Amino acid sequence: MDNFFNQMVEIIKLNKTIGQIAIKAEFESEGTRMSELLRLKEIAHAAEIPMVVKIGGCEAIRDLLDCKDLKILNIVAPMIESRYASYKYVQALERVYGECSFKPKTYINIETQTGFNNLEEISDQISGFVDGIVMGRVDYVGSLNLRRDSVNSQRILEDSLKISSRCAEKNLEFVVGGGISADAVPFLIEINKVSLD
């Protein structure tokens, strides 16, 4: 193992002590290459932390096949905005993992105002088929024509709590994503308070 690899592993191990729970890669907007994903998978394995991969769309079969081959533990579909997109994601998961004994945890991203407005029908569609919903705050504030630093605002907190509440009703996990930094700690504490009540 090279020095950079070892440094990355040590940083992740340190981060785990303060709450890091996974390493994320994206085929979607980051355009992660397979060689990069393989290296990240090695680092994650050495640091004993799971991987999360955001695929390129609701029906990104090639991405799902790659995730299946690598036994990626968590998969997120981006920009889910309608019941139909949710349906296509569920169908794609069934097509790739239907006969497989290995099943990853699966999530959708609600990261636009349109997706938020269609939350009820989307959550109805995925309940029982997908594990949860991720609130993608950076793209969400962009869809509202707000600045990136609005991710921790009261408006976004209220919308996140609405998604969290709907997830609880439909027995889905709720995850806050996008713009996670030290500045997000008060926001996350508020989410946790309500989620644990």
Language-model regions: role of each:
Residues 1-197:
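Expand to "…catalyze enediolate/carbanion chemistry for C-C bond making/breaking, isomerization
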